[in-house]
Amino acid sequence: MAVLKNVQFSKLIKAEGRLREFNFRKSNGIAGPVYHVDVSDDRGNRYYINLHLEDNTWTVQEKNLPPWIQEAVVQFHPAIQEQEV
């Protein structure tokens, strides 16, 4: 029986000129591993993002994200790699 490690962490990532706390949680689904990421904006609205592993790179599935989140997405893959080592 395989043991699946629960991965959950927070990372401060600079977006829109300030540090924001992005919360990452990994789940293992039928189609492979998925990271669920959430972050809140200045008004307290929470955004939920799903990342899937494609060609050894974590890619965002959601469209129409605010520009400051799209700007931060490039930092997600290194943050995940750092935790999984």
Go through each PLM region and give its residues.
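A short, structured beta-strand/loop element
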Residues: S27-E54
